[in-house]
Each structure stands twice: as C-alpha cells, then as structure tokens.
C-alpha cells in the first residue's frame, strides 16, 4: 500500500494487532506483578489514540487457564475504560453471526447489542494458556464474551473435522474475511491437516474481492516431527496470517514464497521466559487494509520491562581463565560482574527519557563452563544486584556444552536445549511422559495403559488442574480391556490374560483415532466428576453446618438448664459452675449431639472411602469372577453401625480430660472402646491420610474430607 493509499478514509480498515499478552503472569511477584496490567493499559490506549476500527488478539490474553479475581477484575476495568464509548463503529458484519459465535449464549457481535455502548470492538481467539476446559468447555474469554467486552471467535466444536467459517466485515468498499482458529494440540491439528480434515470456507459471492485474514495460535517453529504446523498446510488464497503463540517479535510481514501469502508474528507483549527470543524489542501492529492492499506499521511498547541477555564461553578466553589456577573462580566472578555491570549501564542509557518503563531490568548472563571449569554460587553472587534487577535469583545460568554424536538429518539447535523453559512452550508434560517410558527398563514399561493416554492425562492434571484426569483414564482403559477380554472368552489364566492384554494394547496404539477417542471420553468423565464433586461438596458442607449449629444449640440449652438447677440446689458454694460430678455429667450430656453428628459424618466418609477402595482394587482377573464371590459391603456397614453407639464419656475423654479417679476409670473404659473402634476400622480397607495429598489417583472427594 502506497503512502497515499495509507491515508485513513471511509474505505480503510484500521486494526490494532497484538498477541500473547499473558495477563496475570507473575502477578504475585513484588517487582514484576503489575507488568502485564500496565502493558495491556498501553495497548488499549494506543488503540484509542489511533482510532482503530477494532482490536485483533491472537490468543493467550490470560496466562493462567483459571485467572485470579484480580486479573479478571483488572482486565474488565481496562476494557471498560478504553473500549466503551459513544464513538460509532464504522464497519458492519455481513456473515451469519449465529455461525461465527454459535457457541455463545449471545451469538452476535457486541457492538450491535442494544444494551451495550461499544466504541472499539475486540475480536480474539483463545490460546493454549486460556483454552476451554471443564465439563462445559468454557474458558476465561467466554466470561469476557458474556460480559460483552470481547468477541470470541475461531472456536472449533469438533475434534474430528474443522470447518472454519469466516467473519465477513465490510467498511465502504473494503471487505475482509476474518478467519480464526483457536489453539488445538499441535499433533492433533497436524494429523487433521494431513488427513484433509480442515476446511476454510470462502464467501460464495465474488470471492476474489475479499481480503482474507487468518489468525492462528500454534507452534510455528519445529519442535518435533508433528509438534508444529508447517506454513505450507495453510490455504494459498489467504492474504495475511497473524501467527500467535511464538513470543519472538517478527511483526513485519514476510512472504511465503511457496503459498504466496504474508505472515506477521507480533510476538508477546511481556517477557515470560529468559530466552533469546524474548530479548527482541516488543511491538504491536497497526494494520491498514484498503481493498486488497495492506500496510503494517509496528508500534513499539514503552512500558515493557527491559531484558538484556548475553552468552560467554569460558573456554574462549584461555588468556584470562585457566582451570588449573586455584583462583580461577574469583576471576570468573569478576568477569561476570563486569558483564552484568555493562548490561545495567546499557539499560539505564536506554531508559533515559522514558518515564513509563519499569526501573529494574531483566538481566540474564549464560555461562558455558565446559572445559574443566566449576560454577560458583549464583545465590551469593546475586545478592549484589537485589536492588538493581527484577530477577536477582536467576541472573546467571551455568550450562555445559556437551558434544553430541554425529547424526544424519537436520542439526540440533543447542540454543533451545540450554534454554530453561519456564512456561511449557518448548518442554511439555506429555513429551516427558512419552520420553520416560521409551527409555525406561522393560520391567517398568506400561503393559495395559498407553503412553499417549497417560501423557494427555498427566497434562490435564498438571496444566488444567483436573485432579480426576489420571484416575478416570486408568478406569476407562481398564474397563475397555475387561470388556475385550470378556468378549474373547479368554480362560482365567494369568499368562493368557497378559498375552491378550499386550496384544490389545498394541492394536490400540496403532489406531491413533481410537486412542484419541479414549482420551477424550476419559477427560469428559473427569470433568463431569469434578462438577459433581463440587456440587456434592457444597451440599455436604451445608448439611454439616446445619447439624453442627443444631447440636451446639441443643448443647447450650442443656448447659443452661443444668446450671440453673445446680444453682438452685447448691446455693452459693459452687455458683454457676455447679458440682464436679454434675458439671462433668452436664458436659458429657451437652456433647451428645456433637458426638452423634460427628460419628455419622465419619461413618459416611468411611463408607464412601471403602467403596472407592473396593473399586480401585478391582483387577483384570476380577472381571472373570462372579459377582456372588465378591465380599458384601453390608458387613462393613454393620460394624460401623455398632460403633456408632458410644457412651458420652468417649467424647469427654477426648475433649475435656480430667484428673479425678472417677474420670480415670472412665478413661480406661473409653480407651478400650476407642481401641475396639480402631480395630474395626482396620478390618476395612483403611487408607492412611499421610500419602493422600501426593496421590493423583485418589478421589477428589476423599482428598477434600481428609483436608478437613
């Protein structure tokens, strides 16, 4: 687009483009806690000052999948401050909005809502940090969409086939087909592209008159054989691709010579990892589109915290460092000190005249100490810069360059290997699980479960806090294996069962689509179980509170009545306290309601725990046994019902210990009863609470009761 065409008129779209804001990153840090909020304020202010038609976000608006109340509140506050007003919106929507926003309860663009006064619409896809999760598949963007501040588009409702329907925009004579695809696991999306399961729909009328703009949030650089999306997978009719997820700022559009479209990679607006890609200056883009022509003007962000990074190799300075010198460590420290001082001077020099930039910069010095050198204490060294840098704990990163064996194929990027990932973009949980089982010994290999399924379950457990994900996957694959063995009518011999299980597992591993269905079904079960647990927990807590309140009220009434009778009979000798025997009895009597309530609650808890334990101990061989051979659970319930009848002296011994002889006799009686109660408990599948917190396979409801 020429300079004359770039002039704003009624036919020119002005779009502010940004990605990977990661709102709420390190919000609890005393120094860096407000960095993301300040930068979002600057981005929205730039949109208002440049009078853009709308804001386009490429995913990862939030850093956490479940952002905190502070993060959500600040985001809503800033969106209301800058995006609401009386300035009219100059473009219109031509496409069917019920298709573009069909997953929303309000399937229309927010500025056309009669109850809202929007001056700058915000269009956004979701990223891998704020993607939909849970039984209802909701994400943080859905909250903003329901509130009317963000238009969430590009969401795929199917995991088997994706049809991307564009949002059709028109301003004057300029028409834009806005395509969006929210974050999907790269391996799955890669396979869908290979199998021709991704379709980008085009307008039926005069399709060549539209400017095709595509927003995607996936790995662009190659992290594995299928753990990225090649640019060649995208359709060649696209004019411009806004690529999110990659944090290095490459906002200037570059042309793909094979597909003949342009790619703009805005990068993140906040430093989330101390890696070389984050050291590039941060920008947002002001995109102008007129007809089929475009112009991208990059705008530097002035509120981003400075980040300086430098690498040194000790072996490259033989004149300064000798590993045989006993004082070589002091020499290395002095050399590192000089390098850091130089970076701090550069930071102070660049910060002159910019009052909006944070005072303390981020500094990272990577030291290659291969060649016989030894690292020094980083914590002690960092104490010198506590008041001068924002990351005093990890200023220096020591690494050793190890020689790799010669391999055929592409070279290994050692820069990525030595960079410590901090947000899971280069090192993922499921890859670690897969790598572990591939290199593990034969006796610890999985024989029933699959590596892929376990990797997905562990990822859900770690990243999305789905505490039942691992347990439900194990249950689902176990049930499926049991059904397979029953259908084959295998003899109940351990050797034959093991052989059939291995054969069945290999068959499932080859069928990747079936394995994906298994993982999805298990995750759906886990999310549904979490929702049911939360509802039952809230109802259970309400019942407990009511029973405790009633018990306390009955206890207080009992105390008052007994105390009144005591005062009347004994006169002034004991006052309100009453006699020892009566007082002791009244206390025991007043606690009767509490004792009954607590024991009933404990009984319910133990019975539920027994049921869970019984289901967990279910093995494959048990599937061939008749249900009549299984022990009845009524016996256990009967034992507990006998334990419920406890004299009030048991509770008195635990709550109000005394030293009188009578109380000592009660104490011995109570001790014997408590021992008998514990013996009955040991007769059931009793689980110690010491290891429950570390057990990811434990039921969520059991964990909640143990924490009480």
Curated annotation (Swiss-Prot):
Phosphorylated by ATM at Ser-676 and Ser-678 in response to DNA damage, promoting MRE11 activity: phosphorylation activates MRE11 by preventing the interaction between MRE11 and the C1QBP inhibitor. Phosphorylation at Ser-649 by PLK1 primes for phosphorylation at Ser-688 by CK2, inhibiting recruitment of the MRN complex to DNA damage sites. There is a cross-link at residues 255, 416, 625 (Glycyl lysine isopeptide (Lys-Gly) (interchain with G-Cter in SUMO2)). Its cofactor is Mn(2+). One of its GO terms (cellular component) is cytoplasm. Mn(2+) 2 binds at residues 60, 128, 217, 245. It holds the Pfam family Metallophos. It is found in: Nucleus; Chromosome; Chromosome, Telomere. Residues 667-681 have a biased composition (Low complexity). The modification Asymmetric dimethylarginine is found at residues 570, 572, 574, 576-577, 580, 587, 592, 594. Residues 569-579 have a biased composition (Basic residues). InterPro entries: Calcineurin-like_PHP_ApaH (IPR004843), Metallo-depent_PP-like (IPR029052), Mre11 (IPR003701), Mre11_capping_dom (IPR038487), Mre11_DNA-bd (IPR007281), Mre11_N (IPR041796). Keywords: Acetylation, Chromosome, Ciliopathy, Disease variant, DNA damage, DNA repair, Endonuclease, Exonuclease, Host-virus interaction, Hydrolase, Isopeptide bond, Manganese, Meiosis, Methylation, Nuclease, Nucleus, Phosphoprotein, Telomere, Ubl conjugation. The modification N-acetylserine is found at residue 2. Interaction with SAMHD1 stimulates the double-strand-specific 3'-5' exonuclease activity. RBBP8/CtIP specifically promotes the endonuclease activity to clear protein-DNA adducts and generate clean double-strand break ends. DYNLL1-binding inhibits the activity of MRE11. MRE11 activity is inhibited by C1QBP: in absence of DNA damage, C1QBP interacts with unphosphorylated MRE11, preventing formation and activity of the MRN complex. The mirin-derivative PFM39, specifically inhibits the 3'-5' exonuclease activity. One of its GO terms (biological process) is homologous recombination. Residues 599-614, 698-708 have a biased composition (Polar residues). Its EC number is 3.1.-.-. There is a cross-link at residues 384, 467 (Glycyl lysine isopeptide (Lys-Gly) (interchain with G-Cter in SUMO)). The modification Phosphoserine is found at residues 2, 275, 619, 641, 649, 676, 678, 688-689, 701. Belongs to the MRE11/RAD32 family. This is Double-strand break repair protein MRE11. The lineage of its organism: Eukaryota, Metazoa, Chordata, Craniata, Vertebrata. The gene is MRE11.
